[in-house]
Amino acid sequence: MEINDITKEIIGAAIEVHKTLGPGLLEKPYELCLIHELKLRGIKCESQKPVPIQYKGLVLDDSLKLDLVVENKVIVELKATKEILPVHRAQIMSYMKLSSINNGLIINFHVKLLKDGIERFIDHA
């Protein structure tokens, strides 16, 4: 499956979840429902995937967990916050670098229209 097709499926699934649940919940219910929706669509998804951090011979095994990794190609960072902040953008860029996954999405469910809560990231490095 091509990266644009995967991204389209993720966004479509997130829109379906948001349409059903609406804004205002905490992050976890959105995560669980999005995982379920992706599985219903036949999309492979891992939740809370650990990524080891390596620093000069030190390996931190459990210090980083990615909200979702879809088809081993896209990191999905879920939010239920008033707005996506620069720290959230820096967070997903760091996750992409540390995991060697070059594509990411931030999906913020705490918005009236979900299209206003989605940002896509591509690391060209």
Regions found by a protein language model. Name each.
Residues 79-125:
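Nucleic-acid nuclease catalytic cores
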Residues 45, 60, 75-76:
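Short, isolated positions in well-ordered beta-strands
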Residues 39-56:
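A short acidic/basic microdomain associated with nuclease active sites
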Residues 59-66:
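Basic/aromatic recognition patch in beta-strand/loop cores that engages polyanionic ligands
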Residues 22, 66-84, 95:
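Conserved catalytic cores of phosphodiester-cleaving nucleases, focusing on short active-site segments
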Residues 1-44, 115, 120-125:
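Solvent-exposed, charged helical/coil patches
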Residues 55-59, 115:
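Acidic pyrophosphate-coordinating catalytic loop
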